[in-house]
Design a protein with these regions (language model features):
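Short glycine/proline- and acidic residue-enriched helix-loop micro-motifs
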Residues: 61-77, 81-83
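Short beta-strand/loop motif that positions the catalytic acidic residue
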Residues: 104, 110-112
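Catalytic active-site module of serine/aspartate enzymes centered on a nucleophile-bearing elbow/loop
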Residues: 134-172
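Acidic catalytic loop of the alpha/beta-hydrolase fold
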Residues: 115-119, 145-146
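Flexible "cap/lid" loop of the alpha/beta hydrolase fold
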Residues: 1-9, 13-59
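Short alpha-helix in the alpha/beta-hydrolase fold that links the catalytic acid
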Residues: 97, 106, 120-129
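Active-site phosphate/pyrophosphate- and oxyanion-stabilizing loops and adjacent acidic/basic residues
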Residues: 4, 125-126, 158
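Active-site nucleophile elbow and catalytic-triad environment of alpha/beta-hydrolase enzymes
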Residues: 84-100
């Protein structure tokens, strides 16, 4: 969502964009169900407290492990800082209109897993149809975090690299 908002509001900011596991609409039923499964029932909205994070860790230990695997082992509690920073954005309703999406005139690579826990294939396809220069790739057997799905990491990076190489100006 952040990349989409920035490229819609500041069209000259980038020459290309990569959007993984996202759509232009916020808080669909599928999204909210995914959030509850991953973070636990009764998720707070807005700013998180330490008590909220303790409850999440108790209700969803797999979520803690997921974030710990993303960061350096010496920063095993960084997930708390990370979630405190992004949680308000992830839980505050915000969407882009179709008109705002259509303003994005740079090449956009949409990457998503066909088993994404937060965004359906149909939702990502809607976004694909609105973006004038979009490319869409669905990774079979992958969830939301494609780069952490066993066996899918090489494919994820190969797709990203190939897309970026095509966007670079030709060397003379």
């Amino acid at each position: 969502m952040v990349v989409l908002k920035l490229t819609s509001r500041y069209p000259d900011l980038a020459r290309a964009a990569i959007v993984g596991g996202a759509t232009h609409r916020f808080a669909t039923t599928h999204y909210m169900q995914g959030m509850e499964i991953f973070y636990g029932k009764g998720m707070p909205q807005g700013q998180l407290t330490d008590r909220d994070l303790d409850k999440m860790a108790s209700d969803a230990p797999g979520m803690v492990k997921f974030y710990q695997n993303m960061h350096h082992p010496e920063q095993k509690d960084y997930w708390r800082t990370f979630l405190k920073g992004v949680w308000p954005m992830w839980t505050t309703p915000t969407s882009l209109t179709e008109e705002e999406v259509k303003k994005i005139h740079i090449p956009v690579l949409l990457l998503d897993g066909d088993r994404d826990e937060f965004f359906t294939v149909e939702e990502v396809t809607q976004l694909y149809r609105l973006l004038p220069q979009a490319e869409m790739t669905l990774i079979p057997g992958s969830g939301h975090a494609i780069f952490q799905t066993p066996g899918k990491t090489p494919l994820f990076y190969a797709l990203v690299l190939e897309f970026l190489q095509r966007q670079l100006p030709k060397a003379s």
